[in-house]
Amino acid sequence: VRILHVSDCYLPRLGGIEVQVADLVRAQREAGHTVEVVTATPGERLPGVHRVVANLPFDLPVHPRGTAHLLRIMASGRYDVAHVHTGAVSPFAWMGVHAAVRSGLPVVATVHSMWDPVTRGVYRALEAAFGWRRWGLVLTAVSEAAARPIRAVAGPRVPVQVVSNGLDVTSWRPEPGSERHSAVRDAGDGTVHVVAVGRLAPRKQPLRLLKLLETARDRVPGNVAMRATIVGDGPARGRMERYLRVRRMSWVSLPGRYSREQIKDLLAGADVFVAPAPRESFGLAALEARAAGVPVVARAQSGVADFVRPGKEGLLGRTFDDLVASVVRLARDSALRQSIAEHNRETEPVRCSWPAVLEGFAHCYELAGS
């Protein structure tokens, strides 16, 4: 199959969408498909990547004449399907949808974000203005939680499929007998190590995470030692550092951004992984932790609930207090931590493996072409 991916953002940017699209491109090429990418992100020349870049402030990933460029690329490539990737509102990606419809290409559009009420209002207004529901699109969401608000806007005539984000799950699982496997199996000094990984941006509620950790520490018996590591960088880091200083929370560290290998090593010594954001469309970092054998604490209304069941892969809660109680329970109950960790190490989140993801998108491509 000749596939053209369209995404506002792509490598060398390293956000969640950019990395996921790049991994999907790699997996599809390894499966024998011919895959190219069109993006509005500036960067080095890469094989099969078309960069439609305008000289705009802050390297904004948009182009005022993007549709014309996209039409030219689509006309020259003999593609079988256009696969468009959008966040909440992605102007260049939706130019790609419009260009593909005009070119007569089947279109699959993956929504990587959770549509909030404002975003839903925007898409209802766009439907009133342009009638996009009648364009023959197949929409996909990365989780059931993300699909629900999309279905509410798209209506019954627009297919909204759920295709998980992909992960090479075997690469995150500690091998039996390895240092990583031993580190997970043995608690070491007995300190309960709580880990979180993600961009330190307001949408992820990082200050709320610090309050959660502080409250949990207050409720855990004093004879249970705790420490926490929050990996990532972003605009909220300064406020987080001030919070930790003022509250004298020296047991929480902010080491900055980590590579994948560094995150794997960190998870090898983690006892609990926390993903507290309520509007998490998927939660790739939580999936990595689950694949690495770490019990996950997350919101029941987030995309993490697609691969974490209460008491099986971790604990879920709907409120802040629920999450605090879950962290406290896991910190106090080493037997529960151990049983969840063993389950996570011995089973795979099959729906999130690349073979399952490729099969899901192949079905969507067939649906769009029919």
Where are these regions (language model features)?
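Short alpha-helical donor nucleotide-sugar binding micro-motif in glycosyltransferases
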Residues: 257-258, 265-270
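A short, well-ordered alpha-helix in the C-terminal region of glycosyltransferases
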Residues: 336-351
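Conserved donor-binding/catalytic core segment of Leloir-type glycosyltransferases
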Residues: 4, 183-214
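Carbohydrate-associated surface elements
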Residues: 145, 166
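Nucleotide-activated donor-binding/catalytic signature segment of Leloir-type glycosyltransferases, i.e.
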Residues: 241-258
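Aromatic "clamp/platform" in nucleotide-sugar-dependent glycosyltransferases that forms part
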Residues: 278
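Conserved acidic donor-binding segment of nucleotide-sugar-dependent glycosyltransferases
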Residues: 310-321, 329-334
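Short hydrophobic beta-strand element within catalytic cores of glycosyltransferases
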Residues: 295-298
